[in-house]
Amino acid sequence: MRKIYEVAKAELQTLFYSPIAWLIIIVFIFQVSLLFTSALELRVTQMLLGYRTPMLTQAIFANPSGGLLFEVQNYLYLYIPLLTMGLMSRELSSGSINLLYSSPITNTQIILGKYLSMVVYASLLICIIGIYVGFGCCVIENVEWRWLLTALLGLYLLICTYAAIGLFMSSLTSYQVVAAIGTLVILTALNYVKVMWQDIEFVRDITYWFSISGRSVSFLYGFIGSEDLIYFLIVILLFLCQTLYG
């Protein structure tokens, strides 16, 4: 385990020495702030106009039409390719992968260490969202905090799944740009496959299984479904195994 932590630490240091990690954090904070203020402004306007605003927790955070967590989910896949494109591609292009293989570190430790670095970065993104969720818990009366924690868990699993896919794509090529584009194409397809050919029952069942982001919807509604939880874990393990043995 110590070797895995060392690889993860080195990867995080490399990531934060580059402007990409900081740029993503800045853009992410700006986007989440914009989405949160938009959702909050809408509810405040409704209250000023005399409309009833029941279930503020759902209205601000878990509303499919403008809720913060739903909107964040729709954009998460855009950030991951920039984070994962250099995980293995950088080592392959520079030749440093040979040094890693010649060191007393196994291939499994290298892959798991690099994936662990993405898990840590995913935790950072969730903490950023958690700031706004925490603010909501302070200002909303009788807030459904268990609901919000479940929703954050769903987003966290979604990011970790995206990261596993990105790591696999990065291991296929020594060109970071190619890895980023490939990851973006796959994640885009997996995000929008759920809206394709929905009038055909057989195809609808298939696209349901391929839609990764759709699996986090139950979490955003406050439900932890064993089927969805197992689905995320299987996809993560599948792509990690493909990276290791592919």
Regions found by a protein language model. Name each.
Residues M1-Y79, L83-G86, I230, V235-G246:
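Hydrophobic alpha-helical transmembrane segments
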Residues E11, I131-F135, A164-F168, T188, ...:
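Alpha-helical transmembrane segments of multipass membrane proteins
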Residues L34-T37, M55-N74, G113-S174, I224:
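Secretory targeting signals
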Residues L82-Y101, Y115:
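Transmembrane helix boundary and interhelical loop/hinge segments in multi-pass membrane proteins
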Residues S38-N63, L172, A179-G246:
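Terminal transmembrane helical anchor/hairpin motif
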Residues V27-Q31, S117, T183-L190:
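Transmembrane alpha-helical core residues of multi-pass small-molecule transporters
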Residues T108-L112:
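Alpha-helix N-cap/helix-start motif at helix boundaries, enriched for small hydrophobics
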